[in-house]
């Protein structure tokens, strides 16, 4: 008796999307990365007098873009199609979204200058890291969130609805809804009144 088993070998891109370790310099992964790098460069060259053109290019680049989205140049992301923004999204200058995994922003999210959202992570094992092995975990930002200037959000973090993140924070773990949080690492300072 023989058993016929089919094993599907996952591509590096599929591993990336599932949060598994993947080869970051895989040709399929790099193709999308280089395409987006070029798109971001071109979008950032569009003058302020043609803002609507810039927003339209970003809407096409993103996986989802709600009404009222506005992003101040320069802006940078790795893939674009992993980014979903809700209604009335605003990101000030120098926003960086390394979207190796899904990054979702709810409605009425406001981001101050120089903020970074990193879904990409690297193994602590030096040999793996030196072989360009990475992993990616999603980031989720709820509705009605204000993120102060120079904030960094790391892989796998969720920020709840109606929350404010103070300037200069490094968000390394989930932050609940309805709070003010700040610091390095970011922690809840107080609950907001309902």
Model-identified regions with their sequence ranges:
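Flexible, glycine/small-residue-enriched loop-and-beta-strand segment within the central core
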Residues: 48, 75-85, 90-158, 184-194
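Acidic, glycine-centered active-site loop in nucleotide-sugar glycosyltransferases
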Residues: 176-177, 182-185
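Terminal amphipathic alpha-helical/low-complexity segments used for targeting or macromolecular assembly
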Residues: 1-68, 186-190
């Amino acid at each position: 008796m023989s058993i016929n088993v089919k094993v599907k070998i996952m591509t590096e891109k599929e591993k990336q999307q599932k949060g598994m370790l993947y080869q970051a310099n895989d040709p399929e992964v790099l193709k999308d990365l280089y395409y987006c790098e070029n798109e971001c460069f071109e979008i950032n060259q569009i003058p302020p007098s043609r803002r609507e053109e810039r927003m339209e290019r970003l809407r096409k680049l993103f996986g989802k873009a709600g009404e009222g989205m506005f992003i101040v140049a320069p802006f940078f992301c790795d893939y674009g199609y992993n980014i979903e923004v809700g209604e009335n999204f605003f990101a000030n200058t120098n926003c960086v979204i390394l979207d190796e995994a899904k990054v979702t922003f709810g409605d009425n999210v406001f981001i101050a200058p120089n903020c970074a959202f990193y879904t990409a992570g690297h193994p602590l094992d030096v040999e793996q890291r030196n072989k360009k092995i990475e992993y990616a975990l999603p980031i989720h930002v709820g509705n009605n969130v204000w993120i102060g200037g120079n904030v960094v959000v790391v892989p796998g973090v969720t920020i709840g609805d109606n929350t404010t993140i103070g300037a200069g924070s490094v968000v390394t773990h989930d932050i609940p809804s309805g709070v003010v949080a700040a610091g390095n690492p970011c922690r809840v300072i107080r609950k907001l009144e309902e």
